UniProtKB/Swiss-Prot annotation:
Pfam families: Glutaredoxin
Disulfide-bonded cysteines: C39-C42
Compartments it resides in: Cytoplasm
Keyword Disulfide bond: yes
Name of protein: Glutaredoxin-C1
Family: Belongs to the glutaredoxin family. CPYC subfamily.
Species this protein is from: Arabidopsis thaliana
Xref: PROSITE patterns: GLUTAREDOXIN_2
Keywords for this protein: Cytoplasm, Disulfide bond, Electron transport, Redox-active center, Transport
Any one of the GO CC terms: peroxisome
């Protein structure tokens, strides 16, 4: 199944449509990871989120008919051209290094908890 857009480059209007689609996806889930199945950095981020007990939505761009367009739209929107591209509660976090650094600083779990991706068990301690 081919792309809905002709050629390799999207028009400004086509880009706007795909950016809006990406924004709708990001706003629909507490945590979104734009990924590719063969990407080791993507695997690290997904593994970390799983180990932390987070619920998250993964979009494997290499398995989507419009994955290339979505990645281009993410680049246009966030300035980040690579995957993984992670969003928490609608906010752009970044790629693997940024997610790992945020976790190392002790800031990732609170972000995930605030987003509702991890159950807040602090009242049960």
């Amino acid at each position: 199944m081919g792309s809905m857009f002709s050629g390799n480059r999207m028009s400004k209007e086509e880009m706007e449509v795909v950016v809006n689609k990406a924004k709708e996806i990001v706003s629909a889930y507490p945590v979104v990871v734009f990924s590719k199945t063969y990407c080791g950095y993507c695997q690290r981020v997904k593994q970390l989120l799983t180990q932390l007990g987070a619920t998250f939505k993964v979009l494997e761009l290499d398995e989507m008919s419009d994955g290339g367009e979505i990645q281009s739209a993410l680049s246009e929107w966030t300035g980040q051209t690579t995957v993984p591209n992670v969003f928490i509660k609608g906010n752009h976090i970044g790629g693997c290094d940024r997610v790992m650094e945020t976790n190392k600083q002790g800031k990732l779990v609170p972000l995930l908890t605030e987003a509702g991706a991890i159950a807040d068990n602090s009242s049960q301690l």
